[in-house]
Design a protein with these regions (language model features):
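Specific alpha-helical transmembrane segments that line the substrate/conduction pathway
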Residues: 38-49, 92-125, 165, 246-265
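Hydrophobic/small/kink-forming positions within alpha-helical transmembrane segments
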Residues: 23, 45, 81, 85, ...
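Specific transmembrane alpha-helical segments of multi-pass solute transporters/efflux pumps
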Residues: 21, 58-101, 107, 115, ...
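C-terminal-most transmembrane helix of multi-pass membrane proteins
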Residues: 44, 218-220, 228, 254-310
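Glycine-/small-residue-enriched transmembrane alpha-helix faces in small-molecule transporters
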Residues: 1-42, 47, 51, 79-82, ...
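Helix-helix packing/entry segments at the starts of transmembrane helices
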Residues: 19, 103-109, 176-197, 230-266
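Hydrophobic alpha-helical transmembrane segments of multi-pass integral membrane proteins
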Residues: 10-14, 38-56, 129, 133-139, ...
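Hydrophobic transmembrane alpha-helices of multi-pass small-molecule transport proteins
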Residues: 51, 55, 117, 126-147, ...
């Protein structure tokens, strides 16, 4: 295995592990006693001290900060935070205005929006294997979640917010991938978390519900949200996006509903049936097929001869 393939495999494994880790966010949110937007605010705010320590003692980050960062690099890192803030805020309101199943299913359309944006704005082309994997994974998500979805005019606002969530998360993935082209993982994570916290704070303060946890025990789910889901899980995804195409990253994140369903079954005794198993298998098959297609595209690009006139 050459160096490029090793980097790809390592990055893909990081994205998978990160996706599995951030699936716990839904469980921590459910255990929290603060308002949804407050939970999103505390998620990034509690992550900031650990991210700062990481940034402070990371040699590559110090070297880049010690030099002159270009404005585009700074704005890109801030853009990651803006897209993430939009994603979290829209997602929470979507859940409030429609069913959890509808909101989750529509948010998973981020994989489609990522692929469309990559094609329209960055000229990315996709192999049949990748497109087949995308369709399989989406079919799996629909099978896993769709049996609990509902079609009703009273959910139209929430459903539209669910689609908006998908657009925001697609923007987050694409901008994060571009940021990782010139910035380290801790730089992207700290800059985006700080931006997200600043954007969400006023919304968290004016939203109905609890802002501060009422007891020490009530802080524990928020610490899990900030330290495990965000610092550990989200950092793995950001790390992986330096070597894995954003489109493959977005498809891989479809593993989250599978893990969330397993955690809900284990912790809350929520029922799992045949359709859940079928959906999970389709998602796994789709991810592996998309991985194969993305890897083929990368290898083909490396093998293209360089024009001597360029």
């Amino acid at each position: 295995m050459n160096t490029g393939n090793k980097a790809f495999s390592k990055a893909f494994a990081a994205v998978v592990l990160g996706a599995i880790s951030i699936a716990s966010a839904a469980i921590f949110m459910r255990l929290s006693d603060v308002s949804p937007t407050a939970a999103a605010f505390w998620r990034v705010t509690l992550a900031l001290p650990l991210l700062y320590i990481w940034l402070r003692y990371d040699g590559e980050s110090r070297a880049l900060i010690g030099g002159k960062l270009q404005r585009t690099q700074v704005f890109t890192a801030l853009g990651v935070g803006l897209w993430f803030a939009a994603d979290l805020y829209l997602w929470h309101w979507s859940v409030a205005k429609t069913t959890v199943a509808n909101a989750t299913l529509l948010a998973n359309m981020a994989a489609v929006f990522t692929a469309v944006a990559a094609f329209l704005f960055f000229g990315q082309r996709f192999s049949r294997s990748f497109l087949g994997g995308l369709v399989l994974a989406l079919a799996g998500a629909a099978t896993l979640i769709g049996q609990n979805a509902s079609v009703s005019s009273e959910y139209i606002v929430g459903d539209l917010l669910g689609l908006a969530t998908a657009v925001a998360y697609a923007g987050y993935i694409l901008v994060a991938a571009r940021a990782r082209g010139t910035l380290t993982t801790p730089m992207v994570m700290f800059g985006s978390a700080l931006t997200t916290a600043i954007v969400l704070l006023p919304f968290a303060l004016i939203e109905e519900g609890t802002f501060f946890p009422a007891s020490f025990e009530a802080w524990l789910p928020l610490l899990g949200l900030g330290w495990f889901a965000h610092v550990f899980g989200q950092s793995l995804i950001i790390y992986g996006l330096a070597h894995v195409p954003a489109t493959l990253g977005s498809v891989t994140l479809l593993i989250q509903p599978v893990i969330s369903a397993l955690l809900a079954w284990w912790l809350f005794a929520e029922a799992l049936g045949l359709f859940h198993l079928m959906g999970a298998l389709l998602i796994f098959a789709g991810i592996m097929l998309a991985r194969r297609g993305s890897r083929q595209n990368i290898n083909t690009a490396r093998q293209k001869p360089i024009n001597a006139d360029e």
